[in-house]
């Protein structure tokens, strides 16, 4: 599986903490959302919590880590600072054998970090300081970085900063030139709301593979139920992967619908990495030319494993 998939995304250190619903209400946080914050707010929140765990994160990076767990050979490009969190991030990816083509700068902006609040229902709510990760730009990536891969996987979160949005478009241009498939995750429903028109244009004009959960897909398609969204998406010659939590997953391929049941678990501890690890299982099988049902099954297995622990890594 050497040099088959390249992930590009925000290099974010995850800081995990357990809280109750009152904490979210007190801090005006919407459960299940990702809120972008500045460094002073990050530091203020961090000082008010008891940290459970710190590990390298970021949506696409989590997916690449999952592929490495399955003995694949993924690569990842992200931007870090040469600070404490940057060192943690670099060491973490190198340890699990993700080929990390990092852009390291010693500047005023710190390495990105996200406080992940886990409530008793296992839902995750994130406050993310993008830091230097959001400065990943066209100048940091060239054709040599992408040449030879089968798939480039990008996250919707990159559109939250203009610099990374331009880089996203540049990577698409390089991918098309080199006959590389472009895959994208929708990241979260609020990200889709912020960039819906742009994401829809990407789907129509540029993407080969789109991954999102049921709510994200419905928001993208402006539909109230999944069946209506699926009927619209069947019109496009794309691979669409839709996760539905305990209701399983759906794939749209060649105008056909494939359903897959979820893997039952005894106890859910943290939903943080469910979608990211589902994508890892899907891509591992897809790159091995497995049938679409097996791609979904392996995705479901990895998602089930990761939600039984704190954190987004296996």
Q: Across the structure, where does each feature detected by a protein language model lie?
A:
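A glycine-rich helix N-cap at a beta->alpha junction
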Residues: 92-109
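Conserved phosphate-binding/catalytic loop of the ribokinase/pfkB sugar-kinase fold
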Residues: 101, 105, 116-162
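A short, aliphatic-rich alpha-helical micro-motif
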Residues: 145-147, 203-204, 234
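Conserved beta-alpha-beta core of the PfkB/ribokinase-like small-molecule kinase fold
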Residues: 151-230, 247-249
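Alpha-helix C-terminal capping segments
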Residues: 64-73, 117-119, 285-288
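Conserved phosphate-binding/catalytic region of the ribokinase-like
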Residues: 2-6, 11, 25-33, 48, ...
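Glycine-rich phosphate/adenosyl-contacting loop at the front of the ribokinase-like
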Residues: 1-77, 87
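Hydrophobic beta-strand scaffold residues
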Residues: 74, 100, 182-183, 240
């Amino acid at each position: 599986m050497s040099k088959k998939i390249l992930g590009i995304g925000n290099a974010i250190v995850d800081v995990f903490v357990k809280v109750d619903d009152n904490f979210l209400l007190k801090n005006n946080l919407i459960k299940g959302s990702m809120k972008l914050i500045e460094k002073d707010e990050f530091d203020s929140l961090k000082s008010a919590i008891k940290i459970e765990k710190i590990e390298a994160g970021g949506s696409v990076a989590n997916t690449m880590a999952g592929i490495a767990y399955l003995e694949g050979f993924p690569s990842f490009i992200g931007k870090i600072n040469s600070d404490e969190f940057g060192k943690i991030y670099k060491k973490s990816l190198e340890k699990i054998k993700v080929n990390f083509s990092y852009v390291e700068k010693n500047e005023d902006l710190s390495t990105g970090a996200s406080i992940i609040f886990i409530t008793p229902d296992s839902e995750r709510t994130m406050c993310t300081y993008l830091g230097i990760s959001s400065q990943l730009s066209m100048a940091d990536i060239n054709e040599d970085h992408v040449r030879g891969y089968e798939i480039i996987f990008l996250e919707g979160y990159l559109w939250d900063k203009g610099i990374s949005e331009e880089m996203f478009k540049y990577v698409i241009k390089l991918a098309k030139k080199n006959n590389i498939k472009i895959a994208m995750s929708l990241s979260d429903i609020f990200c889709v709301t912020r960039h819906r028109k742009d994401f829809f244009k990407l789907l129509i004009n540029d993407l080969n593979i789109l991954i999102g959960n049921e709510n994200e897909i419905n928001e993208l398609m402006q539909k109230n139920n999944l069946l209506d969204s699926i009927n619209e998406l069947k019109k496009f010659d794309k691979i669409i992967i839709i996760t539905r939590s305990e209701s399983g997953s759906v794939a749209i391929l060649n105008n056909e619908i494939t359903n897959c049941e979820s893997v039952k678990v005894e106890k859910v501890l943290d939903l943080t990495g469910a979608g990211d690890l589902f994508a890892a299982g899907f891509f591992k099988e897809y790159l091995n030319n497995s049938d679409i049902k097996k791609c979904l099954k392996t995705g479901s297995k990895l998602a089930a494993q990761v939600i039984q622990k704190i954190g987004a890594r296996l």
